[in-house]
């Protein structure tokens, strides 16, 4: 499902623990790390897609997390032409995403990267909220920064990462 501007609707998930560290998944058989994300199927709301993707990619159910916030609008990124399937060229530009900030209220042991028959990740870790972006594929970095910045306001005040100090320090 691609919109008239060439963007595929998608959800992104920033999962944090009680220390406001964020979940990073290592793409299977690759050396890049990313947040869980995935397409919104026809008839799904962004929230329904988020819970489906959370289960498929991380093995977590709704009772394992609490929604802290979501982005107000779609955040978009363009995919480089050489990454686009030949049959999609000309009609597909990239992804438009609604991002969710979730708090893990379950245990680390509830995470299961093998919850689906087609796993996305082969490893995971907790990292500081304002983690360096050098391990994220380049064309997604700006959207990650925008989502992290917008959603940081939903974190517990005394544990909130300091945006003004850290956003300029993110590796480009």
UniProtKB/Swiss-Prot annotation:
CDD domains: NUDIX_Ap4A_hydrolase_plant_like. Its EC number is 3.6.1.-. Accelerates the degradation of transcripts by removing pyrophosphate from the 5'-end of triphosphorylated RNA, leading to a more labile monophosphorylated state that can stimulate subsequent ribonuclease cleavage. A motif (Nudix box) lies at residues 38-59. One of its GO terms (molecular function) is pyrophosphatase activity. Belongs to the Nudix hydrolase family. RppH subfamily. Pfam families: NUDIX (PF00293). Keywords: Hydrolase. It comes from Methylobacillus flagellatus (strain ATCC 51484 / DSM 6875 / VKM B-1610 / KT). Coiled coil: none annotated. This is RNA pyrophosphohydrolase. HAMAP family: Nudix_RppH.
């Amino acid at each position: 499902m691609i919109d008239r501007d060439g963007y595929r609707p998608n959800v992104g998930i920033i999962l944090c623990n009680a220390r406001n560290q964020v979940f990073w998944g290592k793409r299977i058989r690759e050396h890049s790390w990313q947040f869980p994300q995935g397409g919104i199927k026809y008839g799904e709301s962004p929230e329904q897609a988020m819970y489906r993707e959370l289960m498929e990619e991380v093995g977590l159910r709704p009772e394992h997390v609490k929604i802290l916030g979501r982005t107000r609008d779609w955040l978009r990124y363009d995919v480089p032409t050489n990454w686009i399937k030949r049959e999609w060229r000309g009609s597909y530009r990239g992804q438009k995403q609604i991002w969710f900030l979730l708090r893990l209220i379950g245990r680390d042991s509830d995470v299961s990267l093998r919850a689906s028959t087609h796993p996305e990740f082969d490893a995971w870790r907790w990292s500081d909220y304002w983690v360096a972006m050098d391990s994220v594929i380049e064309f997604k970095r700006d959207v990650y920064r925008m989502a992290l910045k917008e959603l940081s306001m939903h974190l517990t005040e005394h544990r909130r990462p300091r945006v003004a100090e850290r956003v300029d320090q993110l590796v480009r």
